[in-house]
Curated annotation (Swiss-Prot):
PROSITE patterns: RECA_2 (PS50162), RECA_3 (PS50163). It comes from the Archaea. GO terms for biological process: DNA recombination; DNA repair. Gene3D superfamilies: 5' to 3' exonuclease, C-terminal subdomain (1.10.150.20), P-loop containing nucleotide triphosphate hydrolases (3.40.50.300). Pfam families: HHH_5 (PF14520), Rad51 (PF08423). One of its GO terms (molecular function) is ATP hydrolysis activity. Transmembrane segments: none annotated. The gene is radA. Involved in DNA repair and in homologous recombination. Binds and assemble on single-stranded DNA to form a nucleoprotein filament. Hydrolyzes ATP in a ssDNA-dependent manner and promotes DNA strand exchange between homologous DNA molecules. Belongs to the eukaryotic RecA-like protein family. This is DNA repair and recombination protein RadA. InterPro entries: AAA+_ATPase (IPR003593), DNA_recomb/repair_Rad51_C (IPR013632), DNA_recomb/repair_RadA (IPR011938), DNA_recomb/repair_RecA-like (IPR016467), DNA_repair_Rad51/TF_NusA_a-hlx (IPR010995), Hlx-hairpin-Hlx_DNA-bd_motif (IPR003583), P-loop_NTPase (IPR027417), RecA_ATP-bd (IPR020588).
Length: 311
């Protein structure tokens, strides 16, 4: 295994700076930008470029064949949602190495699904989990351990063990939210088996802080930076990223849906899978897969019960 000190232009002092800044993992270093590395590790941008290039050579980041990509995708894991119908709709569960976005109106089930996944990721693979831990970045004070208890009991899991494997970060503004996502790397380097990062909600702070057209460009730039960090985590650690999103009214919509997801093209392009949640009759929820690289659009119905998400 190649260590940081083995790279050209990296002495003991620089290596320590890189580790302190969260770049102790070679793949994390190889996928960084020179500007990002320069700012966070407090090294010159020229040095940062050389270090990144050396890390890319060490990780053999280059062109690969489609067969290589197919072989690598065999490592992709999936986390059950608790609903067989919803799992089938999205190809077997929430996928690692990808960002999955769910959007919908208040009460459509976004936070409920977030709580469910924080538990099911801990299940063994034969039960639809990854035998791993979760990070829950809570931007709207929606996380409730009492809800985790109900779901854990339904799966007959030890409550204390389940709670200890969910790492909560209460984010109070967009800058704090971005910082907490960046600190996920530190948790993993400390030995935590993080395979799921939940952000509930992704856009709430950005929407509240950057108001009006004059702030739109700055908001989208910061949101793009945040999504880049999340995608890096997904790729580097074979983790799943699950984000919830709000919707807003479309007063000019004479046909189709009267609402649309917040985040614009930046989020639309960054999310690998996009799922629209809607309220149905008799307490049911409707999930519609609206975007996927390889799956067709489709719908399914599930329920939210005391035990969690069920068919």
């Amino acid at each position: 295994m190649v260590e940081l000190e083995d790279l050209p232009n990296v002495g003991a002092k620089t290596a320590q700076k890189l580790r302190d800044a969260g770049f102790g993992d070679m793949m994390r270093l190889a996928t960084a930008t020179a500007k990002e590395l320069s700012v966070k590790a407090e090294i010159g941008e020229g040095v940062a470029e050389k270090v990144i290039e050396a890390a890319r050579r060490a990780e053999k980041i280059d062109f690969e064949t489609a067969f290589d990509v197919m072989e690598r995708r065999k490592d992709v894991g999936r986390i059950t949602t608790g609903s067989k119908a919803l799992d089938e709709l999205i190809g077997g569960g929430i996928e690692t190495q990808a960002i999955t976005e769910v959007f919908g109106e208040f009460g459509s089930g976004k936070s409920q699904l977030s709580h469910e996944l924080a538990v099911t990721v801990q299940l063994p693979e034969e039960r639809g989990g990854l035998d791993a831990e979760a990070v829950f970045i809570d931007t709207e004070n929606t996380f409730r351990p009492e809800r985790i208890e109900q779901i854990a009991n339904a799966f007959e899991l030890d409550l204390e063990e389940v709670l200890n494997k969910i790492h909560i970060a209460r984010a109070f503004n967009s800058s704090h939210q971005i910082l907490m996502a960046e600190k996920v790397n530190e948790l993993i380097q400390e030995g935590k088996n993080i395979r799921l990062v939940i952000v509930d909600s992704l856009t709430a702070h950005f929407r509240a802080e950057y108001v009006g057209r004059e702030a739109l460009a700055t908001r989208q730039q910061k949101l793009n930076q945040h999504l880049h960090t999340l995608q890096n985590i997904a790729n580097t650690y074979n983790a799943a990223v699950f984000v919830t999103n709000q919707v807003q009214a479309r007063p000019d919509a004479f046909f189709g849906s009267p609402t649309k997801a917040i985040g614009g093209h930046v989020l639309g392009h960054a999310a690998t899978y996009r799922i629209w949640l809607k309220k149905g009759l008799a307490g049911k929820r409707i999930a519609r897969l609206v975007d996927s690289p390889h799956l067709p659009e489709g719908e399914c119905v599930f329920k939210i019960t005391t035990a969690g998400i069920v068919d």
